[in-house]
Amino acid sequence: MSQTRWLILLLGLAHCWCAASAQDVVLVANKGVQISQISNADLRAIFMGEKTRFADGSRAVPVTLKGGAVHEVFLKNHLDESPGEFRAQWRKEVFTGQGAMPKAFDSESALIEYVAATPGAVGYVSRISPQDKVKCLVAIK
């Protein structure tokens, strides 16, 4: 193969790897959370304010990122919502006095610190964020 073809192949593979890694999010929870897996239906109910407890009965405190690719992937893959739909639903809940929007963070490191320090907290980060301070949860369909 010529050098040009190798370069095109390598660039294509790098693009595929970056796209794949951008599609992955890790669900994180406070280490005191007793569950190790959660259904997307329960996750959606918690993040949309319909549930305030995990399946084991313990309190759930959802936290989000303020925006960005990881936030969008989480909303799409786990809640089946766009960022606009998510905001609109929460604005309605807040306006009618039925709920308070989840605390949102500018960075994954700030989200991890909050989750580590807050009993019942659950959130999400990219796969590249260090997660030693928190527990990882498995999402099931």
What are the language-model segments listed below?
Residues M1-R5:
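Positively charged n-region of N-terminal signal peptides that target proteins for export
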Residues Q23-K141:
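Exported/periplasmic ABC-transporter solute-binding proteins
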Residues C16-A22:
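Sec/Tat signal peptide C-region and signal peptidase I cleavage site
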Residues W6-C16:
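Bacterial N-terminal signal peptides
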